[in-house]
Amino acid sequence: MATSSSVVSSVPQQHQVFLNFRGDELRNNFVSHLDKALRGKQINVFIDEAVEKGENLDNLFKEIEKSRIALAIISQKYTESKWCLNELVKMKELEGKLVTIPIFYNVEPATVRYQKEAFGAALTKTQENDSDGQMKKWKEALTYVSLLVGFPFNSKSKEKETTLIDKIVDAVLQKLSKISSEESTSGSVDQGRGEEVEEAKADKISGLNQRLKELEEKVAITGDKRDETRIVEVVGMPGIGKSTLLKAFYETWKTRFLSSALLQNISELVKAMGLGRLTGMLLKELLPDENIDEETYEPYKEKLLKNTVFIVLDGISDETHIQKLLKDHRKWAKKGSKIVIARRAVTRDLLHEDSMVRYTYFVPLLSHRDGLNHFCHYAFRHFAAHQNNKEAFMKESKEFVRYARGHPLILKLLGEELREKSLSYWEEKLKSLPKSLSQNIRDRVLQVTYDELSQVQKDAFLDIACFRSHDLVYVKSLLDSSGPAFSKATVTIDALKDMFMIYISDSRVEMHDLLYTFAMELGPEARDDDGRGRHRIWHHHNQDNKGRLNRLLKRPGGSTSVRSFFLDMYVMKTDVTLGTDYLKNMRNLRYLKFYSSHCPQECTPKENIHIPGELELPLEEVRCLHWLNFPKDELPQDFIPKNLVDLKLPYSKIRQIWREEKDAPKLRWVDLNHSSKLENLSGLSQALNLERLNLEGCTALKTLLLGPENMASLVFLNLKGCTGLESLPKINLRSLKTLILSNCSNLEEFWVISETLYTLYLDGTAIKTLPQDMVKLTSLVKLYMKDCEMLVKLPEEFDKLKVLQELVCSGCKRLSSLPDVMKNMQCLQILLLDGTAITKIPHISSLERLCLSRNEKISCLSNDIRLLSQLKWLDLKYCTKLVSIPELPTNLQCLDANGCESLTTVANPLATHLPTEQIHSTFIFTNCDKLDRTAKEVITTYAQRKCQMLSDALKRWNEGFVPEALFSTCFPGCEVPSWFCHEAVGSVLKLNLLPHWNENRFVGIALCAVVGSLPNCQEQTNSCSVTCTFNIASKDSKKGDPYKISFDRLVGRWNKHGNKLDKKGNKLKKTESDHVFICYTRCSNSIKCLQDQHSGTCTPTEAFLEFGVTDKESRLEVLKCGLRLVYASDEPQKTNSDMDLSLSSSDSTPTRNGSSNTTTSSGSVSTNTIREEDSNILHEAQSQNGRGL
């Protein structure tokens, strides 16, 4: 914390603190003690001594405007004084320019906020004498101050007044210190109004205060660890504001130390004066009264050790600078000293003494909000040019901020360039940014850092730009030429990452959009230190690059200076013909890629590359070779793959990769998908480090002629759709994790070729049974056998697959039973048996998801299903023989029984209710037309109990952790259940809610819609969703315009998941019965906002609900609708039939059709309605009622 003298000296002519208080109540006690304590710290305080004598209020307002901080002391009699209230209104008007700190003296913040009790009564009485219509402003000011972070005090508590005063004084000193720091950062200008201040503010980075706070915590200047010696390294992207931050930080805290020093632009100083002068410069700053004539610390060690030192070093680019300045720092820096260093790159091995504590602070990019403020400081410094089109300019401003991604210097340069330019200029500039940088940004931000890179780092940076967003391991493999360890690439990538040229996200190598654009521009012109070209042609969306590419393609032979050559056939829009020797001269080519950006799967493009005659490709340096629709039978004989890492030839014409065995020690990835003529893989026999092999769609391939020694490193093997494959080699691949044999329709027998498998796909194969040695797959987690129509049974020892989590047997129509031993499988979570003939399910306690849909054999479920406590999802769609459903598991979230045309009864209760903070659950009984009346009553009773149970849970648990929609169900029916208090015919429900309807125990709402087919509609609907728009408007005329909110809720949905066919394969046509949709949703933040707005007042409210149904065929409509307001019960929580079923209504007399407060008339919603997302923000702001600084 800065000393009081340093704070006072910066603004001696102005009042620093203005005291706002009720004089009769506090002047001669608390306020006088507070005033004395503030003045004792040399803080200039203004107290309105002359108010009672009739001084003009305008004079007081001027004093408030001149102050830095206002202390609003809210007491019980505060609202008796118009003076206090008008001063408070003025303080609110100065928000952002004046720091207001409230002290709640013997009054609760909530009482101030809602003007309750005697405090509110006094305000009403004061209003009676108010002829200026100030009441609305007074209330707004009281609400404003109640939401600020302040100090509550109750004289009856144990806390002493003196303790409170000490806290207030400390807070004032801290605030003044920060204000002083901000002024010094912006040029120490006077804080009066005018253009000078706006210019100074624009030079300061938005969000600086937050950065200062974070750096303060890292350096530990205050707090429990302030006695530690700390060296903190401040790093960040070029232009991110390191120097601005360090200067502000130094000015803020230098007065806490008797010995301090700030050295800036150290790298430039070393260039100008040499490294040897650094130590002397630092000593002169630390010991200004000494005659420094030595360049070593030793003669001054005793004097330095008398006090802790505060050192800030900015602009260091070399490790030697730090070693020179901080050598043997333990011998001359007293314990508790703080040293802050700003560097252009992270240091991985700085001052490595064992007991030395080191910290790094990464300067963050600006948030979108701070970035927008920072940009607008420069782009709109003179507002007149943009007054006529503010919204359009602001929209464009946000796009520029998104592009800059919070980079302060880029935002500043963009803002300066755009200032006073036309809107059309802004729009064109925004379009050009991804393709071309302005010279100012390139030279001042990016080129400087790029020039500091070594040649290896420059090459790596531009190469990485070619493979932006690719996997880190993949990029390392491409960059390195020393083998699988890729140690050199690791060092280079780490260096680029430390210099913030790249970053790693989700194991992928990324770079800032600006750096990518810079690399895109620089790549085609890049040169080695000796002047030789190292061009990269890859981004045709850039006009300059496209032009270079066209010129390159017109040459009779390729260029030796090209390092990467990427050709996007989709962008070319035409076939390309290359000479047979076109690529022959590209001796330095490392990355060759002919692809189509139109399709991520690289399906066969319309445009192709033609090469008449034999292709010549004598390239040794190629790491990456991607050639979509490769036109030849094989790669040419002169191709040398000794450095090849990645080979990708999708949809090619090859029959074999190359004619003879070739040494390919670095080849790790091979993708030949949909090369339909491929017959022979013998060319890969020397690819001993191969990890991934994709042969999907290679229909001519009949076998894998590769031995285990050739595939020892293979982790992934994809043979999907290899319809010619009849058998697998009997080998053991010790590294294989994933094997895909999906749609190998001629594969009748499977045997284990790897005991390390994690995932196995056998979908659509002709296998009849699994081999007995399947039990060897002890690591198998996922087994997919969908549509294995010949599969009859599973091995008897299937439970030996102890870690299996997913088993998919969908469509295995001959599979009629499961081994009983599966009950021992404790890891199995997903079991999909749709389309099978299975009638009995083993009791697998770990199951979370069970699918039995389209099972035409099963008629009932085991009663033990209720014991599957982990089961969350049960799919019974189109189980046409299913007659009854037993009691379901307690934690079941989704039951889908759509189309169970024989279903008649359900258990009562449908499921056991337990007190819980349950997440959303859905029970679907659509098109179960044989459900009897009792079953429908059970479903509606379950829904009613579920709503009450959830409402009670919401009161017990934190509502913020409970999803909006909590329960929904649907079933055949034509009536709104009787427990809905409000009902209407049609899709619109309008009612008047009595005052206080949303207070106390109100938790949520239950919604109901009856949906039916439109007249003369015979086609079956495939899917639909039912929604409700809920509009609420208060009628409090005293508050001015009505307060309105609006939000949407999904009432329910269902999908048919395919068409039901008759025996001839035709779609069934039927008239669907009416269906009832019910949902329960929690009290949203919007309603809470309304509650806060009118808390303690008697305010009538009007509700307007409009239901709608959406289906692709537009065949459905809402016939009836209903609403129930749900309240938490007062009784202790009960379960099942003992549960209190009373759902409190919004009024004392529940109303149904024809009641006075429920109507079917249509209406419209006002356009000034506050939508829910805005209301959420408002509620969040209102809820931040902190009580301590």
From Swiss-Prot:
Superkingdom of this protein's organism: Eukaryota
PROSITE patterns documented for this protein: TIR
Compositional bias segments (type: Low complexity): 1138-1169
Residues of the NB-ARC domain: 225-478
Positions of region (Disordered): 1134-1189
Keywords: ATP-binding, Hydrolase, Leucine-rich repeat, NAD, Nucleotide-binding, Plant defense, Repeat
Gene3D superfamilies per record: Helical domain of apoptotic protease-activating factors, P-loop containing nucleotide triphosphate hydrolases, Ribonuclease Inhibitor, Toll/interleukin-1 receptor homology (TIR) domain
GO MF, one annotated term: ADP binding
Active site residues according to the UniProt entry: E87
InterPro entries in UniProt: Apaf_helical, C-JID, Disease_R_plants, Leu-rich_rpt_3, LRR_dom_sf, NB-ARC, P-loop_NTPase, TIR_dom
Top-level enzyme category: hydrolase
Domains (record comment): The TIR domain mediates NAD(+) hydrolase (NADase) activity. Self-association of TIR domains is required for NADase activity.
Family of the protein in this entry: Belongs to the disease resistance TIR-NB-LRR family.
Function: Probable disease resistance protein.
Protein name: Probable disease resistance protein At4g19530
Organism for this UniProt entry: Arabidopsis thaliana (Mouse-ear cress)
